[in-house]
């Protein structure tokens, strides 16, 4: 079954090309920013939550919180869109595999790799906490 968002153009600018992640609250797509000629990630709130004021509030708060952060271990927010029909966050696209995929490929993580990843995650969390954001 074809995802209804594939091929969709948001704000006349972001052309969705591929589904890359499925979450509980939103799905994440790879897209082309045709104005800036770059690949981006677009997080779209699932339609079943589009009329739920609590989910809308949380989604908007997430975009505001991330937008103020500037850290190498945190994706950058480029744009947001909140209309009656769709709510989305446009973010930096990071090419590669997820930490989960890396761990599945490696089997048991080497302790040095585990420490490396934990340090990177903690640095990002510390940066957010320093700015009053709790994850």
Identify the residue ranges that each predicted region occupies:
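AlphaC helix of the eukaryotic protein kinase fold
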Residues: 46-68
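Protein kinase glycine-rich loop
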Residues: 16-23, 28
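Conserved short submotifs of the Hanks-type protein kinase catalytic core
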Residues: 84-98, 102, 106
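Flexible N-lobe loop architecture of eukaryotic-like protein kinase catalytic domains
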Residues: 21, 61, 69-73, 86, ...
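Protein kinase catalytic-loop region centered on the HRD/HxD motif
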Residues: 121-133
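Activation segment signature within eukaryotic-like protein kinase domains
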Residues: 117-118
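Conserved N-lobe loop of protein kinases adjacent to the ATP-binding glycine-rich P-loop
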Residues: 32-39
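Activation-segment/catalytic-loop signature of the eukaryotic protein kinase fold
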Residues: 80
